[in-house]
């Protein structure tokens, strides 16, 4: 069977059709393979892997070389979904030339597009230059984790009409610069609805309510890998933490009681 690849143009057309599309993070080959088989439309190698896969405190600690390794692994497991890589902190903020080079490295190892956080005149110019270079860009407004320190923590953005209008203004500028989609993170549902209705590119909700064109979650939250914390806007569809611990305990017991390996499990 021929598998039809999801492209940037596919995502753009979904906006006009009124349908929704799904986005999940993945950080390794097998997870990417399984969620691709499940029909997820966009797979994001999020810089959230800094915390979920590498144990860092924030996304600030992950670098280009690490993101390349994870991107290569994920891309190898995907046949259908659009593969997007989060550009890590300081990989694109210093100068246009190095930013294009770093983004290009992600494309070389298998990404179909990159995601860039924030808004400034520099960012607008960068998006334009990247698109001209042949690198599709997913923009990201609202709460932007790489700006955690300047935003004063994990705070909801766009709570007033003025703040919403400002996000919309920035979003329209990014749209004109060439971004093919926009993540809205931790934005009130009504604000995100207003922004979505006034853009021609699709919006992706990360805690921004149901009226965006797509929803994105971290795969670890969806799978239930952690019991300590789950964001308010996330939904658990499984209990992988309990499953993993149970399997490991049973293996440990079988080893220590001598029941593993059995005669059927040796040469």
In which residue ranges do the predicted regions lie?
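Alpha/beta enzyme core
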Residues: 2-267
């Amino acid at each position: 069977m021929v598998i039809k690849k999801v492209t940037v143009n596919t995502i753009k057309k979904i906006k006009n059709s009124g349908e929704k599309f799904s986005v999940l993070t993945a950080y390794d080959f097998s997870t990417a393979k399984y969620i691709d088989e499940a029909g997820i439309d966009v797979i994001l190698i999020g810089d959230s892997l800094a915390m979920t896969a590498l144990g860092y405190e924030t996304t600030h600690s992950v670098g280009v070389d690490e993101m390349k390794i994870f991107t290569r692994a994920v891309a190898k497991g995907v046949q259908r979904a659009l593969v997007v890589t989060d550009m890590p902190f300081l990989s694109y903020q210093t100068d246009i030339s190095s930013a294009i080079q770093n983004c290009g490295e992600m494309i070389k190892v298998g990404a179909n597009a990159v995601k860039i956080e924030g808004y400034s005149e520099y960012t607008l110019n960068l998006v334009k230059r990247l698109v001209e270079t042949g690198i599709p860009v997913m923009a990201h407004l609202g709460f932007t984790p790489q700006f955690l320190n300047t935003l004063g923590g994990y705070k909801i953005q766009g709570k007033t009409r003025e703040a919403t209008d400002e996000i919309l203004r920035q979003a329209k500028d990014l749209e004109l610069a060439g971004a093919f989609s926009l993540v809205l993170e931790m934005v009130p549902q009504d604000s995100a609805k207003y922004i979505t209705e006034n853009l021609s590119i699709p919006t992706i909700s990360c805690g921004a309510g149901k009226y965006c064109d797509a929803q994105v979650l971290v795969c670890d939250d969806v799978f239930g890998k952690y019991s300590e914390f789950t964001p308010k806007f996330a939904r658990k569809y499984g209990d992988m933490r309990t499953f993993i611990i149970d399997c490991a305990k049973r293996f440990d017991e079988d080893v220590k009681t001598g029941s593993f390996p059995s005669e059927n499990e040796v040469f």
